[in-house]
Amino acid sequence: MVITGNELWSKVQQALQHNLSKPTFETWIRPAICSGFRDGELTLIAPNSFASNWLRKNYVQTIEAAAAKIYGQSVRVSVQAQEEDSAERVLPPMTSASIPSPLPTAETTTASVAPSSGPRRILPGLNLRYVFNRFVVGPNSRMAHAAALAVAEAPGREFNPLFICGGVGLGKTHLMQAIGHYRLEINPEAKVAYVSTETFTNDLIQAIRKDGMQAFRDRYRATDLILVDDIQFIEGKEYTQEEFFHTFNALHEAGRQIVIASDRPPSQIPKLQERLISRFSMGLIADIQSPDLETRMAILQKKAEQERMMLPRDLIQYIAGRFTSNIRELEGALTRAVAFASITGLPMTVESVAPMLDPNGQGVDVTPQQVIDKVSEVFDVTPQDMRSSSRRRAVSHARQVGMYLMRQGTDLSLPRIGETFGGKDHTTVMYAIEQVEKRLSSDPQLASQVRRVRDLLQIDSRRRR
């Protein structure tokens, strides 16, 4: 049979699309491209080393079987990683195929999924909308999404624990709960627990008060998969950290999967025991960044299709351009716009919706990224320096000015500003603003630099309350 490598790979993809789940196909199979077919060997290129390793370990035999059936004789498959400088050519564009159909409207699961042999039934409390099919993958989240799916497919193997970090409203909880849904779909009898750190702490306190520590330990250590959200709130809680450390060890040694989410990496969580930092870092740390414009537009388009709404492209682009911080704000803006148009009877256009989203022109003047970029330019540091924990004098001063101008030029709260600068505490932001205000009156050079950044950003001199 005479066939080119691209033709063979295309036919293999078509065959596998019917045999694999949609998240699996979209994450691992669709992005790979064929780079050659010679002497019975099909060479594939994956977007990165992470994807190539996963394909080799989990799907090469499946691909070889499908290829052999199509080609009529055995086919060897080799997988390589795309070079970093050309990786963008491999990453697939966002298409309508990535947009899933709506799920049931119920918000959370209500039935127990733990087997009756367990010490107690564990209610996952998962939001039915938080599944892989409803997660829009962009450059900001591709690694975290792939890691989450890998863990869902093979828990307790490669990435244990999986530590997902990123700012507020970027999709950490969505990915965590998607892992839980995936496992329960494969095995409805799996013991899955999704808990916030606050819930874990409260359960621990109640166990201590009621002399129920053994029941507490049995409950958490009997899980097959534990999903722990907002682990940053464990900071400073010594006894909670102690108990979580032992729970972590018990689960990890038993080969149970642990998934943790935080707004910052383990090393940046204040007052976190070194041994927990070590445990949290021993698997894979997957970071989620703020989505770019194209991803934000894809998110809005997906939400509109799920709600069966037809929105003009310029309105989607307008909303995506105005709300850049996180996905919750983005979807919230769309919800407000739809409600406004429905109540007033006005058409869904930029002209009719813009005044509601930005009353009196007093909305967000600049984006956080613009502030960081311009301050970095004027103060001769890098944006990475601004978000780092570096205490070098030049970096520290630039970071303080960035926080000061972000408070003036955006509507972000102090905690949100802190998150933008690598997860700094809101008290750090307050201190930075106070220091800059004090120095402006006595440091002409600083005043000149601040004026220059303000001019570049066109920020007025008012102080937001």
Curated annotation (Swiss-Prot):
Keywords for this protein: ATP-binding, Cytoplasm, DNA replication, DNA-binding, Lipid-binding, Nucleotide-binding
UniProt region (Domain I, interacts with DnaA modulators), positions on chain: 1-73
InterPro entries, A to Z: AAA+_ATPase, Chromosome_initiator_DnaA, Chromosome_initiator_DnaA-like, Chromosome_initiator_DnaA_CS, DnaA_C, DnaA_dom, DnaA_N_dom, DnaA_N_sf
Residues bound to ATP: G169, G171, K172, T173
Region spans: Domain IV, binds dsDNA: 342-465
Keyword DNA-binding belongs to the record: yes
One GO-annotated biological process of the protein: regulation of DNA replication
Transmembrane segments: none
Chain residue ranges for the region called Domain II: 73-124
Protein location: Cytoplasm
Similarity annotation: Belongs to the DnaA family.
Record's function text: Plays an essential role in the initiation and regulation of chromosomal replication. ATP-DnaA binds to the origin of replication (oriC) to initiate formation of the DNA replication initiation complex once per cell cycle. Binds the DnaA box (a 9 base pair repeat at the origin) and separates the double-stranded (ds)DNA. Forms a right-handed helical filament on oriC DNA; dsDNA binds to the exterior of the filament while single-stranded (ss)DNA is stabiized in the filament's interior.
Protein name stated in the entry: Chromosomal replication initiator protein DnaA
Species this chain originates from: Prochlorococcus marinus (strain MIT 9313)
Gene (name only): dnaA
